[in-house]
């Protein structure tokens, strides 16, 4: 008689995990050996004992750093009570963030503002981790980025009209018949990655191509102050595919957190970069970056064709991402990489948009040590969207838009005026520019002065739209 009555039932991966084995390349060999023993009549208790020596030693638990043990650089200053209140909140959350045991350095940019519960990396925040990728520090909008294309002396209105006819704002993707082609090579690469090889990711990679989402994402048309040439600038991220990768990455990081550092804040959980899972996640990030770049490209190219414009230079940069320098992983949450070789396709120039009534800055980073090699990604906020709406009082969104953007062609593609995206909801642009210069974070080489822009607008909650669609 064997040690259990169900000796014909195979040993599965669930058995191995219950016994303490970690999923990985060795799983296949372990399962083969286990089931060979099973076929010989061994019971589960005996098989578990035979394989026990294969269980890797658990790494020691990592406790959070002590308060203030790891400092962070401040590249921001306050000039009024709102700015001071904002900086105090950013300092509080950064102090908690820097207790994460993998972190070795941090910095905040002139556009810094809180982005969640205390301890969450703020917008305009940078965190350098050793051998760790923190999904919560690149956020759900992975690879949120900006791209610019020089359109020569095309008429800005014609370009904005053309762009409005081809872009897509709002939730979800494009319907059949209105989709852009997604690279088959890229889709095949998705299928080879454990984080991206699922029906939902593959479907959204096709449906969301050529879409921009909502919130602060935009399509901007303006003229170069240096050359007088027309340019289009888009701002958006990786849409559904990136959001799903973030969700799966956070779930995996949480499992590691419980094992490696249960006292670390949940939002700061990490995936060990040198683990099999970490290498696969890093590769998934690079594939999402390629998808996001293609997403910008199709909108730009379709606009060029619809406007009949000539094409000059085109470049882009991300500002929600993870960058590797040596042994450290630099997490930028609303922070622009400001060193020349941050990526193989880096041009040396980056874009820093401010608000719909101000120019987009064309900058060359200074790789400042006190910025950990980053510069701002925009203007940032001193108070929340809801507080901004409260301060407007009885003024209508339409009246406020007219007052703040006189002479500009501002359009809301999929909804009413979103007052939380008006210039007054952001920090004063001139102060942000002054601090970029004062802290020597980047050299501003050009200004793309605004003609107009398109944004999603004030949309009803997604669940409300989905509910109406089911009726």
Regions from the PLM with identified roles:
Residues 91-94, 101-108, 114-123, 131-139, ...:
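Domain-length cofactor-binding catalytic modules of enzymes
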Residues 151-153:
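Acidic, low-complexity central loop/insert segments
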Residues 147:
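Divalent metal-dependent hydrolysis catalytic cores, especially in the metallo-beta-lactamase
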Residues 83-88, 96:
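Histidine-rich, glycine-flanked metal-binding segment
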Residues 1-60:
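Charged substrate- and nucleic-acid-binding regions of tRNA-handling and nucleotidyl-transfer enzymes
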Residues 66-73, 168-195:
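Acidic low-complexity segments
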Residues 52-82:
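Low-complexity, highly charged intrinsically disordered N-terminal segments
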